[in-house]
């Protein structure tokens, strides 16, 4: 009787593992399709130099690059920007965004009077 339960438990665990693998594979495929669509749109709205610059930004600050990609795609789809965006225009966009998100830190050192 214990062997039956063990076999049944093993079967349930195997099915659950297969289901999780299937879901992970589907999620990976969905992300790859989305990335391919984004890439295709960015090829249309960015010059090769601008795409290279964005790829360099993505290496250093992936979150910033992702935000810029999403904004550019949204602006292009709504017709608010003229394609293709040059490297110089992308530099201006990057400068504006980094100025908005930049945090300035101030360090103050006070003497404690230890002598």
UniProtKB/Swiss-Prot annotation:
SUPFAM superfamilies with a match to the protein in the record: Double-stranded DNA-binding domain
Any one Gene Ontology molecular-function term assigned to this protein's record? DNA binding
**Sorted alphabetically, which InterPro entries does this protein's record hold?**
DNA_bind_arc, PDCD5-like, PDCD5-like_sf
**Sorted alphabetically, which keywords does the UniProt record give?**
DNA-binding
Which GO cellular component terms, listed alphabetically, does the Swiss-Prot or TrEMBL entry include?
cytosol
Q: Which family does it belong to?
A: Belongs to the PDCD5 family.
Q: What is this protein called?
A: DNA-binding protein STK_13740
Q: Which organism is it from?
A: Sulfurisphaera tokodaii (strain DSM 16993 / JCM 10545 / NBRC 100140 / 7) (Sulfolobus tokodaii)
């Amino acid at each position: 009787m214990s062997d039956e339960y063990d076999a049944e438990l093993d079967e349930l665990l195997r099915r659950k593992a297969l289901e999780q693998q299937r879901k992970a594979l589907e999620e990976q495929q969905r992300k790859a399709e989305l990335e391919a669509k984004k890439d295709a749109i960015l090829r249309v709205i960015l010059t090769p130099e601008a795409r290279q610059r964005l790829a360099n930004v993505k290496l250093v600050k992936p979150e910033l690059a992702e935000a810029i990609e999403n904004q550019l795609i949204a602006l292009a789809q709504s017709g608010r920007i003229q394609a293709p965006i040059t490297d110089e225009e992308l530099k201006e966009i990057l400068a504006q965004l980094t100025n908005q998100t930049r945090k300035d830190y101030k360090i103050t050192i006070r003497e404690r009077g230890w002598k």
